[in-house]
Regions:
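Aromatic-rich, lipid-facing transmembrane alpha helices and their immediate juxtamembrane interface loops
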Residues: 1-170
């Protein structure tokens, strides 16, 4: 990915984040928790990219550029934040089972999505053959939900104790 493409992705997900904040009726503490969860997963995501390249599971061509990792971290942080607000609402409604389903769905849907993107845009990322890259990618998606939601819960508190913004009928 080029710098411009990453910045466009960040802008798109920032707009999506604003929409998800509105529709989930999240209060400021929960919004800050989602951003903190995104920042925490950003560290995991950038580390996973580096580990996957070192193991030969995948290759991200721009990873040698100095500012690439910072932009990638910011991209992970912003693009994952809407997910945590959605997971928060699911957990608020369904409890631990809802969280388990979110982890499972993310783990199942994530790798095919990444493989499709890699096939469509090989200049952005390529995967090695075999089962190891797919399992590693699935693990990263499980961590996406667990790490990010865990940090959001530390910052924002338990989902069931949270009140909703705009609960006056709007």
């Amino acid at each position: 990915m080029t710098t411009i493409q990453i910045l466009l992705m960040i802008g798109f997900y920032l707009g999506l984040f604003v929409a998800v904040v509105y529709f989930t009726r999240a209060r400021m503490r929960r919004v800050m928790g989602a951003l903190a969860g995104g920042a925490a997963f950003g560290l995991v995501g950038v580390s996973a990219v580096a580990l996957g390249e070192a193991q030969g599971w995948w290759r991200v061509p721009q990873s040698g550029v100095a500012h690439f990792h910072v932009l990638l971290w910011l991209g992970f942080a912003i693009s994952c934040a809407p997910d945590y607000l959605i997971v928060w609402r699911v957990v608020r409604r369904f409890g631990g089972w809802g969280l388990a389903v979110c982890v499972l769905v993310s783990t199942i849907i994530g790798p095919p999505r990444d493989y499709w993107i890699a096939a469509s845009f090989p200049a952005w990322m390529t995967f090695a053959s075999g089962i190891a890259p797919a399992l590693a990618d699935a693990t990263v998606y499980a961590l996406l939900v667990l790490v990010g939601y865990g940090v959001m819960r530390l910052v924002g508190g338990p989902a069931r104790e949270d009140s909703l913004a705009r609960s006056n009928g709007l």
